[in-house]
C-alpha cells in the first residue's frame, strides 16, 4: 500500500520537473526569435519548433498541476498550470497569423507564467 504523502510528493516533483522544462523552453524561444525578426530562415523554423515543443511541455505541466491539485486540494497552482497550454495555443495562432507585436507581448507573458509556475511549485510545501 502506498503512503499518501509519498504519492503526493511524487506528484509535486512531477509538477516541478514539468514546470522547469516549460520554463526552459519559454526562455529558449525568445532567443531564437531574433532570427525571425531579422529575417533569418533556419532560426525561424527552430523558433516555430520550440514553440510547438513549448505547447507539449505546457500540456505536461498542466497534467502535473492537475495531479498535484487533486492530491493536495490546492487548486491555485493547478489553475496556473492549466493556463499555460491555453497561452501556448494562442501564442502559436498569433505567430501563424503573423501578428508579430501581439505575439511578442504574449510571448513575454507566457515566459513569465512558465517561470512563475516553476518558482511557485518550488515554494509549495510537501503534502
What spans do the regions from the language model cover?
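Polytopic transmembrane helical bundles with strong interfacial aromatic enrichment
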Residues: 1-127
Amino acid at each position: 500500500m502506498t503512503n499518501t504523502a509519498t504519492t503526493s510528493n511524487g506528484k509535486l516533483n512531477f509538477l516541478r520537473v514539468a514546470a522547469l522544462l516549460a520554463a526552459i523552453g519559454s526562455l529558449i524561444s525568445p532567443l531564437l526569435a531574433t532570427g525571425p525578426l531579422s529575417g533569418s530562415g533556419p532560426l525561424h523554423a527552430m523558433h516555430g519548433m520550440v514553440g510547438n515543443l513549448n505547447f507539449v511541455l505546457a500540456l505536461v505541466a498542466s497534467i502535473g498541476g492537475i495531479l498535484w491539485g487533486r492530491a493536495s486540494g490546492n487548486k491555485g497552482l493547478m489553475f496556473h498550470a492549466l493556463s499555460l497550454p491555453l497561452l501556448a495555443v494562442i501564442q502559436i495562432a498569433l505567430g501563424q497569423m503573423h501578428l508579430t507585436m501581439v505575439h511578442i507581448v504574449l510571448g513575454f507573458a507566457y515566459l513569465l507564467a512558465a517561470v512563475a509556475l516553476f518558482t511557485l511549485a518550488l515554494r509549495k510545501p510537501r503534502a
